[in-house]
Every structure is written in C-alpha cells, then in structure tokens.
C-alpha cells in the first residue's frame, strides 16, 4: 500500500482507490464482500494465474482496470513505487475519447434512498457494446485493531457492490452500516472487455522466501482515474 500511495501522490493526478478485502472462506477479515471478490476473480483471475499461481495474490493492484500487478514479489514500498508510477503514467484505452458520467443520491432518512446514474458519449457513440456500469460503496476509513497491517486503520474499504442494469437509470437502495464513523461514499464505475487487453504486469521477482506472504487481511487495490463519478452518500453508523 505504501508504494502505491507514494506513486499516486507523486503523480499529482486525482485518483480513486478501492480496497477489496477477502470474503470467501475468510474468518479474520470483517470487511470482505463476496460479490466483489467474485467479480475480481472473474475479471482478473486468469491474468493473475498467468503471472503467479494464484487467482488473487494479496496484495494485488489494478491500475485503471487494465494493468494488473499480481502480488508484491517481496518488494518493499520504495521498490514498488516506480513500478506503480509507470503504470499510472500509461494512457489507458480510449484515453483520447470523452464521455459524461453522472451519479446522484437522494434520501429523506439518510439510509434509504434513490440512486440515479448515466453515461453519455454524444453523437460519437464510441463505447464498446460490452460496456457495463456498477457502483461501489466505499468507507473512507475503518478501524480494526486486530488487523495485520499493524496500524489498525484500513482505508478506502469496499463495503458493497451494486451491479446496475444498463448505463442509465435509477434504483432504490439501502446503505450498509458504516463500520465506524460517518464516511461512506458511492463510486460509479464503467467497464468493458477489450478484444486483446494488456492486463498483466509481472510477475515480480521475489527478493526472499516470503514471496507474496499472504497476510490474514489480504488487500486487492483498484486505482481508477476520475473517469467515472464519485459522491459522498448519506451515511449511518454501525
């Protein structure tokens, strides 16, 4: 995480970070979302297997949904920083295109409300037919003293995933309880499948026998440029 955050800070670009925690067969991590983990495996699992012998090698990082860093290879934050920086500076597919993405949340009781979203490209209509939209509910910071990061605080935690029907529409939704604090937000993501995606960076060569050292709380990060939309939602405490 340290190397990724240092690279983001140096890039000077506004970014959104989504931290996925393990859920399936996980007994220690309270933050996992099974549907989000299944999506990760379906979207990045094969690419991860091509780089390392695991479908989800924690910690793994995906930049702009296209460049996968599977595991850390035993490297520390400073060593990983230039690797992430290179991926952050790599233009993503369709970076020369433009679109308008919007997301709104309305609620009378701060818990139950209506989500409205849209994605418009104008007359060019360049979006691939495979384009789909989804929303992640993200908690900015959650304290869990029993966690393995030694800090007690976990940031940008994905708490729920909402698969949307179409790239425009509205739906009723009930926010999950925040783990602590009052810091839930909604992040709208648009994704597509490319015929020949450049999805893998790695594997990284390990420097010691620790290889990828899967911790008890395994994090999978997704970093996206601000191509979608993000809003602060009404929240409630646990």
Please give the residue ranges for each predicted region:
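Short, conserved sequence motifs used for protein processing/export or organelle targeting and
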Residues: 19-20, 29-65, 71-214
């Amino acid at each position: 995480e340290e190397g990724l955050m240092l690279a983001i800070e140096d890039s000077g670009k506004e970014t959104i970070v989504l931290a996925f925690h393990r859920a399936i067969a996980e007994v220690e991590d309270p933050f996992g979302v099974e549907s989000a983990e299944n999506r990760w495996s379906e979207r990045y699992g094969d690419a991860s297997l091509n780089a390392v012998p695991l479908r989800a090698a924690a910690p793994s990082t995906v930049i702009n949904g296209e460049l996968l860093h599977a595991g850390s290879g035993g490297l520390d934050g400073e060593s990983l920083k230039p690797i992430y920086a290179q991926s952050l500076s790599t233009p993503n597919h369709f970076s020369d295109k433009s679109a308008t993405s919007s997301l709104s949340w309305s609620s009378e009781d701060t818990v139950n409300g209506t989500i409205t979203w849209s994605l418009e490209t104008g007359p060019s209509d360049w979006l691939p037919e495979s384009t789909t939209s989804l929303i992640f509910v993200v908690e900015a910071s959650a304290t869990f003293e029993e966690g393995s990061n030694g800090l007690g605080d976990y940031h940008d935690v994905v708490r729920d995933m909402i698969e949307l029907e179409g790239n425009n529409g509205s739906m009723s939704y009930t926010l999950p309880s925040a783990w602590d604090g009052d810091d839930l937000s909604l992040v709208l993501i648009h994704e597509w499948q490319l015929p020949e995606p450049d999805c893998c960076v790695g594997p990284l060569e390990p420097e010691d026998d620790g290889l990828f050292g899967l911790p008890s709380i395994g994090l999978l990060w997704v970093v996206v440029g601000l191509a979608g939309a993000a809003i602060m939602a009404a929240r409630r405490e646990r």
